[in-house]
């Protein structure tokens, strides 16, 4: 189900201004989603998509394009083990809930953990420190962090602003999806300022006029 949510708030009206270069799939299995971009969570919108890993841990995860590792996070919460890659296109791809990193990243992570004397780390790297090529294995899928089961969380962001973009804009031809969305309600959230005479959420019931029309 390919949802195109309208965000009146946290994401505002994000207009894509960067070119869409050719990206490859981060997984070499048929892509099935377990969560869409923009899904409403208890305290945030879902900033990416969740890709199923056939209920398995340890599938190779591939860099979607040339670039460099700009950030690596290890945490018992959030994305767990995560790799951030900056690309020359002005995009950043984020791969979350990894079971482990590729050896060339893991070596650096372990060194940082020993230096900081802490399991949890959040390290940033400059361009050229950890280069990657499209198709390089950067880690292996897992269930680390705040995850309810094995899957790969994938973000695509604007590097400069870190605004999230819908990964389906790049991957939709590869994602098996034949379930049409059903609109039930439209909910408005304010980000800054006032909406009408209120700053609270407003919800309106969607009335179906005909197939695909509300």
Question: What residue spans do the PLM features occupy?
Answer:
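Bacterial N-terminal signal peptides that target proteins for export
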Residues: 1-7
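Histidine-centered catalytic micro-motifs
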Residues: 149-156
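Aromatic/His-enriched, Gly/Pro-containing loop or helix-boundary segments
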Residues: 96, 103-134
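A short, sequence-level motif marking secondary-structure junctions
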Residues: 97-101, 170-172
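Surface-exposed, glycine-biased beta-strand/turn segments
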Residues: 18-92, 120, 126-128, 133-134, ...
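Hydrophobic h-region of N-terminal signal peptides that target proteins for export
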Residues: 10-20
């Amino acid at each position: 189900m390919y949802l195109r949510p309208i965000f009146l708030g946290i994401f505002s009206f994000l207009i894509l201004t960067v070119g869409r270069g050719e990206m490859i799939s981060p997984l070499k299995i048929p892509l099935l989603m377990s969560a869409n971009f923009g899904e409403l969570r208890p305290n945030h919108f879902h900033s990416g998509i969740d890709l199923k890993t056939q209920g398995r841990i340890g599938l190779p995860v591939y860099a979607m394009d040339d670039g460099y590792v700009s950030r690596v996070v290890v945490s018992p919460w959030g994305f767990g083990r995560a790799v951030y890659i900056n690309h020359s296109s002005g995009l950043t791809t984020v791969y979350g809930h990894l079971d482990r990193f590729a050896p060339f990243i893991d070596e650096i992570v372990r060194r940082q953990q020993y230096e900081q004397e802490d399991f949890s780390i959040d390290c940033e790297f400059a361009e050229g420190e950890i280069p990657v090529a499209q198709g390089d294995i950067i880690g292996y899928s897992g269930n680390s962090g705040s995850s309810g089961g094995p899957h790969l969380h994938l973000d695509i962001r604007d590097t400069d602003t870190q605004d999230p973009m819908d990964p389906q804009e790049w991957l939709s031809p590869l994602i098996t999806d034949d379930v049409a969305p059903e609109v039930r309600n439209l909910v408005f959230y304010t980000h800054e300022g006032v909406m009408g005479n209120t700053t609270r959420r407003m919800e309106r019931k969607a009335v179906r006029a005909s197939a695909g029309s509300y």
